[in-house]
Amino acid sequence: AVGFAVENPKAEIFAFDVNEKALIVARQLAQKNDVEERVKFHVNFDEHSLKGILSRHNGSRTFIFMDVEGAEEHLLNPTVNPAVLNCDVLVELHDCFKPGITEKIIDYFHRSHKVEIIVDYDGRQKASSLNYFDISEPDWRFCTDESRPAKMRWLRALR
């Protein structure tokens, strides 16, 4: 969230995390980067939170960046929240937890958006080739691998 705010100085950012300790660190990071006025941090998130944000920003350019461990099927459902169809979306897909979720999310957006699937690199071992810092292999793996049972995919849906 803080990185988005730094890179998009006119954007208002709404950030949610279930981990309150992570939110404390994120707030500190926002202060250190002078973006705390534009990043609103919240611990609870559900379809009502999303509806509220989208209703207040109806008509403005809105980008949803979402990683919600399988809840994307419900949160991005246009039947639950039609306003999502007015947004650009980047969402991590969690077929490893909910098989078939990718096809459902594609179905939500393919008529109104240009949809693209981004596939995780083939094998977590490739992460070591991206280690630009002097960090041991086990520490680098700890920082970059979520220990998922399969490659992860992201869906990008642009209007």
Please annotate each region the language model reported:
Residues E12, R38, D88:
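Residues at the starts of beta-strands that form the adenosine-phosphate
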Residues F14-F16, H42, L90, E116:
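Hydrophobic/aromatic beta-strand patches that form the interior of the parallel beta-sheet core
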Residues F16-E73:
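S-adenosyl-L-methionine
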Residues T62, H74-I105:
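A short alpha/beta connector and helix-capping loop motif
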Residues C96-R159:
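Rossmann-like AdoMet/SAM-dependent catalytic core
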